From Swiss-Prot:
PANTHER family: FATTY ACID/PHOSPHOLIPID SYNTHESIS PROTEIN PLSX, PHOSPHATE ACYLTRANSFERASE. InterPro entries: FA_synthesis (IPR003664), Phospholipid_synth_PlsX-like (IPR012281). The gene is plsX. This is Phosphate acyltransferase. Belongs to the PlsX family. The keyword Cytoplasm applies.
Amino acid sequence: MIRISLDLMGGDFGPQVVIPGAAKALDRHPDISFVFYGLKEQCDPFLAKFPKLKEKSVFHDCELAVSMEEKPSQALRRGRYVSTMWRSIEAVKTGDADVAVSAGNTGALMAMAKFCLRTMANIERPAIAAIWPTLKGESIVLDVGATIGADAQQLMDFALMGGAMARALFEIERPTIGLLNVGVEEVKGQEEVKEAGRLLREANIDSLEYSGFVEGNDLGKGTVDVVVTEGFSGNIALKTAEGTAKQIAEYLRAAMSRTLLARIGYLFAKSAFDMLREKLDPSKVNGGVFLGLNGIVIKSHGGANAEGIAAAIEVGYDMAKNGLNQKIENDLKKYHAKRLPPIGPEAA
């Protein structure tokens, strides 16, 4: 049984979307049990519609919910110990849940997760990893917003964590890793990126395969399983991709409704357009994973629909079931053990 703590008040729509999303996830994975954190008066009407979900969950009434507009410092000061967001994270710390999921304020969620769970040994900064649709299937891109201006060692740690996530999510033995850069040549790019490339080449890690630098146009190609970058460029890439997907979808909608002939043509090609629409639907790959913490936290898109919430829950389910944090910890220990100077007789 995988236990998932869920912030029912998170996101733009709160319980009216989060609860149906949880019900969808439960239908697909009957071995999930939920620990809900919400405001009882607002949640009860929606929970009443899903008796099966109610049977597989425990509800905790909380004092307040963190708004989407609150600054991280304000949310931490006001909502620590008493908010739906904090308590859903705390459930992971206390062992009452295997993973926490929230569609709430990203900055507040990261601040609370870092304060409550703390970072793993040998990790200076956490990262947010996004699942990225590609021509070959899916890949992982990190960091997409947690750490602005990462140094070479932090990028190296991101590569280790991203590789562990790829093994947990895609069940591949040795994922390929690429560093996002302005060119594939080794002489190009910022010093931090070039140094991270050197660290990855020399590390000789059994659990991942370093494939060199990749460019922005490689993200959608699926050139590598994991793309590593710092949070500033990663977040811009993520938002650009989301905006481009919406733009293409709008272009198609406008083109298909412009004339009678176009509408007739759409009817004949409906299955192909439906397939394209599904590929462009961000809810299908919803769920950013906070990596580097002593516990698994999943961030759903704030504007996600019920299907998107279900997708985020399923990401958390897969991460917990496949031992994400154990994989990360093992890889970090192996790598950092190699970096330590020998002691005792071996040092002579």
